[in-house]
Swiss-Prot record:
Family (UniProt): Belongs to the anthranilate synthase component I family.
Highest rank taxon of the organism: Bacteria
Protein name stated in the entry: Anthranilate synthase component 1
Protein's organism: Bacillus caldotenax
A biological process from GO: L-tryptophan biosynthetic process
Length: 508
């Protein structure tokens, strides 16, 4: 036990009720997936950046031992519960519930270079929109899960891939009534806990079966056992219905989606291992919480807040990566000059400017990057960057909600497009097209759109994907686009079943 560390802790305990202690390690022989596998009995989330080609790939986080949850069934009220499920407070909004946690915990600020050092981690389902906009609630919610669910963890593992550093952050929680001896014992217990976690993290990975190198990113998903929530003929008719709304001037675009249900025996973690190998992405995540596993590989940021600077990076327009540098350059040039891709992208940039403008100081909204080719491991996109500075009276959560949901998964204008989608789509979207996010005690937020995402629950995996319908859309091609967008996840599921599943399969 460090005497200096203990003295600092005792001084901080006079001012704060929740105090982080930090240990740094060189992360040269461990990596996030292996550490999570070793800590799976207590760990609830793994957030990774796995695309070396992406400018956003640097940090990964693991959360261990949640002590509070912030959750909502419908988005209309939020409950904060302790680790035993006892409700502590009910609040009308996400922001008010989070602010109650901030006040109650009274967390000592932590000056570290990693962007997230503790706070809430979880998801907002797409259906949350009905609580904040004039969008009717869908009548058919056939996959029961919370609309919002966030956890606050006692311990956090933060990896910096660039520096090859690991920070282990452990929060000591006090009531404010402890004697000095009790505070000293709390510090000693935290030291023992961190030593135990570090030892578990460094264990060999003997209990995890090796992933065969034959797992193929190029394999085509068969969809053989998948059942769609959409009859194909009805989907094609609904594409035409959206086009009629466009012709009438209601919207410019709406993103119509279909959901695939697949019976699974392989667990969500096996699917995640395949997915990160097949389709690495800037935003990869695995959650095991509230009876649900969530597996995702999202390419697209929803919104980021860092030191009150807000950023949205609109993505629209896609080409595969070339098989040679020359083909790669040709495809990039083709994408950049495609008039349809550019028109859609400009529309999304305007949406992002509007979203940030709702919460930013007047005159601070800028577009420092416009129509840049962003290259990822398997594809390239047109990418722009829209930034602004949060207004003084705006909470970072206000920025998250201003951008929710993304225009790329709803349409334009957003609210009218979502009203049309609620009318046409046969089932509620659930998590799909919502957000995966962390909300830091320090006000930092990072979030991605919940696309390329599977929900694994009660022996089934649910995968949903959409296509942006515009005036000249061809229904058959839009149907194929939804399947193409779901194919990476379906491929991961099918390979996980082939490699790891045992026993009889259910039927959707």
């Amino acid at each position: 036990m460090s005497a200096d560390g203990l003295a600092a802790f005792l001084a901080e305990a006079n001012e704060f009720r929740t105090i982080p202690i930090v240990r740094k390690f060189v992360a040269d022989v461990i990596e996030p997936l292996g550490v999570f596998a070793n800590l799976r009995e207590e760990a609830v989330f793994l957030l990774e950046s796995k695309d070396d080609e992406s400018p956003w790939a640097r940090y990964s986080f693991i959360g261990v031992a949640p002590f509070l949850t912030l959750e909502s069934e419908t988005g209309e009220t939020f409950s904060v519960k302790d680790e035993n499920g006892n409700e502590q407070i009910t609040a009308p909004t996400l922001k008010e519930a989070f602010q109650w946690v901030e006040r109650t915990l009274a967390v000592k600020p932590l000056a570290e270079t990693v962007p997230f050092t503790g706070g809430a981690v979880g998801f907002l389902g797409y259906d949350f929109i009905s609580a904040i906009e004039k969008v009717p609630r869908h009548k058919n919610r056939d996959v029961p899960m919370k609309t919002a669910y966030f956890v606050f963890c006692e311990s956090l593992f933060a990896f910096d891939q660039k520096k090859r550093e690991l920070l282990v952050i452990h929060y000591i929680r006090l009531s404010g009534n402890e004697t000095e001896e009790e505070k000293i014992e709390a510090y000693r217990a935290a030291e023992r806990r961190m030593a135990d976690l570090a030892a578990k993290a460094a264990r060999p990975q003997a209990e995890q079966p090796l992933l065969p190198a034959e797992s193929e990113s190029g394999r085509t998903a068969s969809f053989a056992k998948a059942v769609s929530n959409y009859d194909k003929k009805q989907f094609l008719r609904d594409v035409e219905a959206v086009k009629r709304y466009i012709a009438a001037g209601d919207v410019f675009q709406a993103v119509l989606s279909q959901r695939f249900c697949v019976p699974v025996q392989a667990g969500g973690f096996a699917i995640y291992r395949l997915l990160r190998y097949i389709n690495p992405s800037p935003y990869m995540f695995y959650f095991q919480l509230d009876g649900v596993e969530i597996v995702g590989s999202s390419p697209e940021k929803l919104i980021q807040v860092h030191r009150r600077r807000v950023e949205i990076d609109p993505i629209a327009g896609t080409r595969r990566r070339g098989r040679s540098p020359e083909e790669d350059e040709r495809l990039a040039d083709e994408l950049y000059h495609d008039p349809k891709e550019r028109a859609e992208h400009y529309m999304l940039v305007d949406l992002a400017r509007n979203d940030i403008g709702r919460v930013a100081k007047y005159g601070t909204v800028e577009v420092p990057v416009l129509l840049q080719i962003g290259k990822f491991s398997h594809v390239m996109h047109l990418i722009s960057k829209v930034v602004g500075e949060l207004d003084d009276n705006v909470h970072p959560i206000d920025a998250l909600l201003a951008a929710f949901p993304a225009g790329t998964v709803s349409g334009a204008p957003k609210v009218r497009a979502m009203q049309i989608l609620q009318e046409l789509e046969p089932t509620a979207r659930g998590l799909y097209a919502g957000a995966i996010a962390y909300i830091g005690f320090d006000g930092n937020i990072d979030s991605c759109i919940a696309i390329r995402t599977a929900v694994v629950k009660d022996g089934y995996a649910y995968v949903q994907a959409g296509a942006g319908i515009v005036a000249d859309s061809v229904p058959e091609l839009e149907w194929k686009e939804t399947r193409n967008k779901a194919s990476a996840l379906m491929n991961a599921i099918e390979q996980a079943e082939r490699l790891f599943a045992k026993g009889e399969r259910a039927v959707c």
